[in-house]
């Protein structure tokens, strides 16, 4: 009897560096062969097989999220949490990782959690899935990785999903995502700058995150490499925003060369620190500069908009007590983050 791993359990398998080789070689399951049935009597054996397959203990696996069809016995236990699915199954919903063991794809996980996560949390999840990091219970607060999906793939998957819980919120969130973030701070900064005013953002144009800039010969001589990847790039405005986080303090000379190379090729460079983001006056000056460069007219914000903006920044930006020496950050751990044993 097959099991279909879903929700947070599926995310942890998908995003764990320890399990990346298993996921890398998994193939999409045949949509016509999917039948969401799990016999309770066969679950114990399936969990044991899954632990052997993953090379982890049942304690490391944690309580397993499984998705089942409506009408299937689904009394949750200390080992298993069942989730009912009654709508049509979207195409590309599962990866087959072994005989009888299926894993929800990143796109399907996003849809599953859209029914329960607040919008901002869903946006942060989407940015991580489309980026090259994932929140984890580690000192940094995240692990590096490779993108498991893209905004294009996620949007296409959600377009195919019909009549299911969370679909409207998932589609709304996907419209605000951008590929390529390398850290939670990049995602947070992007959302503050680009989300609509009605959601607390500044409504600026979406930049490219960590996109490739090919340097001229002169700029290459300065930087030492033919290309560089700015944190936030507004291509039409020739504007770059560089976040001064932990990497800057490790190698400030390299960042200075980056700035000189970009300016040599005509880019305007704006540096941003966590302190500036937390200071409303400094943040607004940065926003005005981006708006001017991109041709965005800034309208006065009502009291309601200002309140939403403060609430958004309070949710996305680490508190002052979580800023460590050298502007290193300690992020609040989300419940769907990787546990330490899988990071």
Spans of model-derived segments:
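Surface segments flanking catalytic/ligand-binding clefts of nucleic-acid enzymes
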Residues: 146-343
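Short gly/ser-rich loop at a beta-strand->alpha-helix junction or flexible surface loop bordering the NTP-binding
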Residues: 1-165, 197, 301-303, 310-343
């Amino acid at each position: 009897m097959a099991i279909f791993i879903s929700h947070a359990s599926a995310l942890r398998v998908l995003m764990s560096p320890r399990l990346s080789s298993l996921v890398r070689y998994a193939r999409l399951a045949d949509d016509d062969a999917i039948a969401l049935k799990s016999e309770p009597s066969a679950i114990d054996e399936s969990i044991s097989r899954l632990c052997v397959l993953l090379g982890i203990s049942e304690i490391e696996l944690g309580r397993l999220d499984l998705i089942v069809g409506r009408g299937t016995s689904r009394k949750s236990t200390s080992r298993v949490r069942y989730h009912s699915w009654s709508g049509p199954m979207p195409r590309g919903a599962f990866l087959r990782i072994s005989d009888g063991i299926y894993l929800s794809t990143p796109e399907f996980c996003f849809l599953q959690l859209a029914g329960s996560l607040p919008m901002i949390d869903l946006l942060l999840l989407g940015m991580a899935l489309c980026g090259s990091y994932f929140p984890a219970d580690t000192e940094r607060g995240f692990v590096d990785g490779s993108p498991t999906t893209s905004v294009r793939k996620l949007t296409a998957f959600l377009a195919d999903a019909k009549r299911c819980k969370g679909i409207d919120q998932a589609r709304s969130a996907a419209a605000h995502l951008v590929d390529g973030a390398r850290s939670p701070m990049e995602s947070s900064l992007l959302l503050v700058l680009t989300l609509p005013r009605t959601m607390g953002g500044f409504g600026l144009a979406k930049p490219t995150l960590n996109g490739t800039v090919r340097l001229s010969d002169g700029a290459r001589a300065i930087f030492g490499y033919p290309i560089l990847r700015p944190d936030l790039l507004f291509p039409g405005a020739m504007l770059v925003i560089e976040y001064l986080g932990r990497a800057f303090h490790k190698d400030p000379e390299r960042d200075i060369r980056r700035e000189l190379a970009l300016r040599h090729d005509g880019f305007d460079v704006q540096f941003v620190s966590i302190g500036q983001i937390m200071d409303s006056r400094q943040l607004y000056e940065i926003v005005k500069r981006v708006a001017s460069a991109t041709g965005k007219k800034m309208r006065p914000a009502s009291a309601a908009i200002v309140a939403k903006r403060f609430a958004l920044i309070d949710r996305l930006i680490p508190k002052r007590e979580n800023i460590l020496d050298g502007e290193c950050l300690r992020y609040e751990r989300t419940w769907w983050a990787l546990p330490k044993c899988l990071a």
